[in-house]
Amino acid sequence: MPDDNDYRPMSGKSKMGSSRADGKPTRTKIDLFPEYIRHLPSDKFAVWDVVGRVLRSEEVKNAFIQHLAPGLMKRFGENFAGVGMYPVPILTRDIPGYRVFKHTDSLWKGITVQLYLPADNSNKNIGTIFHERLPDGTKPKVTQMPFVPNSGYAFAVWNDTWHSADPVGPEVRTRDSILLTYFVDRGIWRTLRNRARRVGNFFLNELRSLKRS
């Protein structure tokens, strides 16, 4: 795994409710694009470059689209398979104090995937929690994903996919995972936005690298 100082803080919903008294970010990330990870040591670059390329592949994307067909059809209709999806894989690291309140993902996203990367089964109870929204507005817990090796989840993003994460406790050193987000990639505005975000993240990473050097 990369060193802590190779990561940078997350933003947006991924940091909601995750502040600590000392102000330290509780979720950090590494975008798994070659231009972003090029500052990693060569042995680590070789590993994460392959991981990023596989996760951005058409084969992986098509497999998720096939398995999530009911949810995608519910949102996009019968022609869901023709909706463009732009993959953005990131390596994330959460530390004690991290939490996320109940929310649904932004509709800029089409598919959300999280792949857990724990070293063992010692922290099974810190996986993502899924909720059901009842007619009275309450959102009780339906299930919780176990945070164990070779596991994770994926769902088609819609306005009923409520989920959260309980606070990561002091007994956990890091909560490592890969977030693979497929952003809806149709229409000129969405297409430009998706690529502009990648360019913007590249420049932020270069500035950060210059400050560290």
Language-model segments: which ranges?
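Catalytic core of non-heme Fe(II) oxygenases with the double-stranded beta-helix
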Residues: D43-R56, K61-L180, V184-L192
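Membrane-proximal basic amphipathic "stem/tether" segments
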Residues: G187-S213
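Non-heme Fe(II)/2-oxoglutarate
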Residues: M1-H67
